[in-house]
């Protein structure tokens, strides 16, 4: 598997876990909103503004679908995800260990 494919799969797995957590606790989306607000004070990257628009306008089901999507658009957005800090270190470690690159 090429390295970018592995990275995309790992990112998707992390965001699937984020989506599952948001289903149970929708208020956690405020972590992403706070991250974006903080990041936008020093970086006006278009993708951050795009995430802000998504978080302001998307319904929870639409947001969850985006986080779980394997589309190129979703993969592009996940590269600048505002969901840092939503998973606990233990949750993140468990996912990372399951998605380590395979050695030839």
Predicted segments with their positions:
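Basic, alpha-helical nucleic-acid-binding regions used in initiation and control of genome expression
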Residues: 1-104
């Amino acid at each position: 598997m090429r390295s970018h494919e592995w990275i995309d799969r790992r990112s998707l797995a992390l965001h699937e876990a984020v989506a599952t957590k948001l289903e149970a606790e929708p208020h956690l989306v405020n972590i992403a909103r706070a991250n974006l607000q903080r990041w936008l004070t020093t970086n006006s990257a278009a993708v951050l503004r795009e995430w802000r628009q998504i978080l302001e306008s998307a319904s929870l089901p639409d947001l969850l679908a985006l986080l779980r999507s394997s589309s190129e658009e979703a993969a592009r957005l996940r590269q600048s995800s505002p969901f840092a800090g939503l998973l606990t270190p233990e949750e993140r470690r468990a996912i990372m260990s399951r998605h380590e690159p395979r050695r030839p």
